[in-house]
Amino acid sequence: MSANSDLFVQAIDPARLDVIYSSGGDGHGNRLRPFAATGQGEPLRCCLRYAEPGEQITLISYAPFDHPSVWTEVGPVYIHAARCDGYRPTGRLPGQLATGPRVLRTYRADDTMDYGHNTVVTDDADLGPIIQRLLGERDVATVHVRTLAPQCFLYAVAARLAVEADVEAGPIVR
């Protein structure tokens, strides 16, 4: 990969969000409880940006994998309290969430974790080149970008060419 435009970035799958919004709950027994964002760093996983002060948001329990897996971790994530326009992939990392500090967890094509390439970025480094390097590793198909301290899921990244080559590919976070 030669540029950040070679990246396929995915927020929470809009179909999964539709179920959450229509049911009024996150599927883990938690009802949606809207509140006003403080604007003090609430990263929205629906549109991959930080919430602005006063925006109506909610906290849900979310697992990036929606299929049986020993790597299924449920954790708290912020989303808008009502459906938004979502994240429109640009081939680049989402601007407000494109730097460290972050934990980068690597997964193989079968969604098993590749421990050997998991990376902790402790400074405010640009994640693009680091993620590109990780996706260039033979066994790495997807990188999950997570917050540093609580390690909450932010978004997933795959190589655009790998996603385009697989015509049967669904969401990279299943």
Predicted regions located by residue number:
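Compositionally biased, non-globular sequence tracts
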Residues: 1, 38, 43, 172-174
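Polar/acidic, low-complexity leader/linker segments enriched in S/T/G and N/D
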Residues: 1-7, 12
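N-terminal, charged amphipathic alpha-helical interaction modules
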Residues: 12-95, 99-103
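Intrinsically disordered, low-complexity acidic/polar segments
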Residues: 68, 88, 113, 164-166
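Short intrinsically disordered coil segments
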Residues: 93-96, 119-122, 170-174
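Short, hydrophobic/π-rich interface segment
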Residues: 105-142, 146, 159-161
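Short Gly/Ser/Thr- and Asp/Glu-enriched loop/turn motifs at secondary-structure junctions
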Residues: 147-152
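C-terminal edge-of-domain segments
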Residues: 153-163, 168, 172
